Regions:
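A short acidic/basic microdomain associated with nuclease active sites
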Residues: 1-12, 18
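SH3/SH3-like beta-barrel fold
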Residues: 162-164
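Acidic surface patches and DE-rich sequence motifs
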Residues: 7-8, 23-25, 80, 199
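Conserved catalytic cores of phosphodiester-cleaving nucleases, focusing on short active-site segments
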Residues: 15-49, 65
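Short, solvent-exposed loop/turn segments at secondary-structure junctions
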Residues: 5, 38-40, 81-84
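Metal-dependent nuclease catalytic regions and adjoining charged, substrate-binding loops involved
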Residues: 45-59, 64-159, 170-222
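Glycine-centered tight beta-turn/hairpin loop motif at sheet-sheet or coil-to-beta transitions
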Residues: 10-12, 26-28, 166
């Protein structure tokens, strides 16, 4: 009844399989199992195009599961939430893609700076539908968390360390990583405990020093 969990990068990156299946007519080898429900529109696209073309994110998830579980096939099963119609598809492992996706995750996790934008053009279709559009292309500030703080480092053993010696929880000494701030925020001064920005849109000088939540209240992505 429980999912099967695999982890990489010391535990910073993990994926849970819905199960492992055996006894398929097409192959006796074990398959990772991935179960999804979807609305009628997405389900019809899945039937017509298959998982890779209609839901590439799901397909990538299947590839990561096969990579971490060291299995060569995945059985992807979907249910139409509107009609209860079912769809099943056997997905073949692509070793190169699996390696690439896990390596990409590792690079992002242990990088000192966030990855580059998918596209510099805010009208690019994938950017417009991204949940972080307001941060990458707009004027919103990301949420306050240890992951967005300059003082915190993810360690290779799966732990987190804080340069301020704090427990790894959101605290009153949070300092945003400058590279994740809105594009109109230009750094004008910085030190070990602060970063000062000029908002190019309004001309306002904003000093991020302690208590980011209070300083940027109202500018947050979720605000």
């Amino acid at each position: 009844g429980k999912q099967i969990r695999f982890a990489e990068c010391g535990g910073h990156f993990a994926l849970s399989l819905d199960g492992v299946g055996e006894g398929f007519a097409e192959s006796k080898q074990p398959h990772t199992l991935e179960f999804k429900t979807m609305n009628d529109k997405n389900f019809k696209a899945m039937k017509n195009l298959g998982c890779k073309k209609s839901k590439p994110v799901y397909w990538a998830q299947c590839q990561i599961g096969m990579h971490l579980g060291d299995m060569d096939r995945c059985y992807f099963f979907a249910v139409n939430k509107n009609t209860d119609e079912m769809y099943g598809e056997r997905i073949k492992r692509d070793r190169a893609v699996g390696n690439l996706l896990v390596s990409k995750a590792k690079n992002i996790i242990f990088s000192d700076t966030p990855p580059a934008k998918l596209n510099e053009d805010p009208s690019y279709w994938q950017c417009r539908f991204c949940s972080y559009f307001a941060v990458c292309h707009g004027c919103k500030v990301p949420e306050v968390s240890c992951r967005t703080c300059s003082h915190v480092t993810p360690e290779q053993d799966g732990t987190w360390s804080c340069a301020k010696g704090k427990p790894v929880v959101t605290c009153d000494e949070h300092l945003f990583i400058p590279q994740i701030m809105p594009k109109d925020f230009v750094v004008t001064d910085a030190g070990d405990t602060f970063v000062e920005y000029e908002d190019q849109d309004s001309g306002e000088i904003i000093r991020n020093e302690n208590n980011s939540q209070a300083i940027f209240d109202g500018r947050m992505q979720n605000g």
